[in-house]
Amino acid sequence: MARERIRSRIDRRNFLTGVAVAGAAGTATTIMPQGAAASATTAPLTDPAARPSALPPTAKMAAAETGTPQEIKRDNGTPGSDFMVDVIKTLDIKYLPCNPASSFRALHESLIDYGGNKSPEFLTCLHEESAVGMAHGYFKAAGKPLLTLCHGTVGLQHAAMGIYNAWCDRVPVLVVGGNDLDAAHRPPGVPTFHSAQDINALVRDFTKWDDTPVSAQHFAQSFVRMYKIATTPPYGPVMMSLDAGLQQEPIRENGEKLYIPRFVPSSPPQGDSGAVKEAARLLANAERPVIVVDRAARTPNGIKLLVELAEALQAPVVDQGGRMNFPKTHYLNRPPNVIGQADVIIGMELSDFWGVVNGFIDNGDHGIGFNESKIKAGTKLISINSVELITKSNYQDFQRFQVVDVSMPADAEATLPALIEAVKAAIPNDRKAAIAQRGEAIRKAYTDGRANVRRNAAIAWDASPVSTARLVMELWAQIKDLDWSLVASEGNVSFWPNRLWPMEQHHHWLGRSGGYGVGYGAPASVGAALANRDLGRFSVSIQSDGDLMYAPGVLWTAARHKIPLLAVMHNNRGYHQEVMHVQRLANFRNRVVNLGNDMSPLGTSIENPDIEYHKLAESMGWWAKGPIKDPADLAPAIRQAVAVVKSGQPALLNVWTQPR
């Protein structure tokens, strides 16, 4: 109602109809609204009431607003952007999170008018990094990629961090960047500032493929190709530069019939049969085999396959959490310290195999610390990792080089069936009793470990600000009977959800950001919640305070598009990772760290003033409550918030927490 009242009072064209325009040869005199001239002759300009509140429009501006648009002779052919929409629709892309811009105005108009704003539906974002982050989170919940559009040089630079996260996290995101390529025809001024000869170069180091189509048919081929490349393991973001002129150019009848290539998915690469057989031999004859996984389970079936392999070997599984790889309730789920006793280690889709088997001790000299091996001499190492197929050189996401004994540049999930069959065939009959006995020992260690985790979680249970373990368990108590999905939670709450919640299904945990870029959590949560809304799941995120402030506008997007999400703030009022870095260096240098007037080293705290995240969320259309500092207030607040989210709205709780 408020919006309607405002529109009845203020209208740009009605406002400008009273503007008096005078001048000759392009020269404009002072322009005032009707009735202002008479008062201006009697009131001195030094009188504040007589001064205009804003600069009046120029004659040119007024004419542009009130005049009749110039008649432009147009070709009656089909707009090229309409055909582009036809291409996009063949791939069943459900949503398009995007910040609007002129370099893809033709495609935008075709999507919402010709395409009916369906498949894809345009989702208004307030920042390009939010748009890419939403697509990132959506894929991990739905298993299907989204398309996003970026505006030239400036929009793509905004999006770059989100694209890098997707690259490191092996997630397909389809990015199309609008660009005014033809210097002879591009508009002068701002559009030229926002153009480049090769905008794809901005992100080429961390995209799987890119192209710049020069015709409508070229677009059709390249768009289907980019979708195919992005969705073939190893997954990754892809990029297309799309000329604004090409979008607006009509399709003329010149005898050449346009066609849309049919999409046929590629099968993922599988491990060589000889390498699979050798890996199975090593595992079947090992005394203490260990399985380490990071992004091995691409789908729910990947979890089942990993359970089958682990049970065949009675081998402990170390899940590094890039995806939900292995049930937390399974007795073979074990912490990383089991690596030290291993004689054979198989790593599947690991981000950092070197870091799995080696330690790095920070001695205060960055990049010089001490290295130490975590494994016994002679331990055999097996790697199945599809990322070897797309390794690049500039960005160092491939980590340190680790020598292994068997290396398969292949998709782990696709290779698992053959590996399981080979392992079962390779286990000698006289080893089966020892393998079963090994499993019983691991089962006891699992039971003891769970009890120890629960004891540790009880420490500072009644503390204020709230302990992160208390926060996590109070949250669990309210969502445990729902079909829940933890859509985002970096390791900043001491991994309590992964340690305490009975995570068993693929959607229970969607992993982390990949590139560890701050600002991922909120957009990815909203994107995943969008997917879960359509799947009937309840979405919850544990939202870091500093992370939210990188892209808070995504809260508005969630409210605007009715995306239900429960965001519980981990509001420790600081960048605690950096708190520890500065404190560590001060300790090394035998100094007392300078806190100023804050609780943390200068430059690391987010306080004085404290950000009222609940009010921020309320201003963007969320139900919100806070600040919550007393743990006794948590349960009723979470109960309220859960009810709000179940009704279809987003809700945020601003909880003051301990640092970790």
Summary of predicted features, one role per range:
Residues 140, 293-390, 503-535, 550-553, ...:
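Glycine-rich, anion-gripping cofactor-binding loops and their flanking helix/strand elements
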Residues 81-84, 89, 107-112, 441-531:
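Active-site diphosphate/adenylate-binding microenvironment
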Residues 69, 197, 225, 229-285, ...:
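Conformationally flexible catalytic loops at phosphate/diphosphate-handling active centers
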Residues 185-194, 339-341, 416, 496-659:
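Thiamine diphosphate
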Residues 178-220, 319-442:
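Glycine-rich, acidic loop regions that bind phosphate or pyrophosphate groups
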Residues 51-75, 214-217, 241, 255, ...:
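Phosphate/pyrophosphate-binding active-site segments
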Residues 31-81, 85:
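C-terminal segment of N-terminal export signals and the immediately downstream linker at the start
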Residues 1-10:
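N-terminal secretory signal peptides
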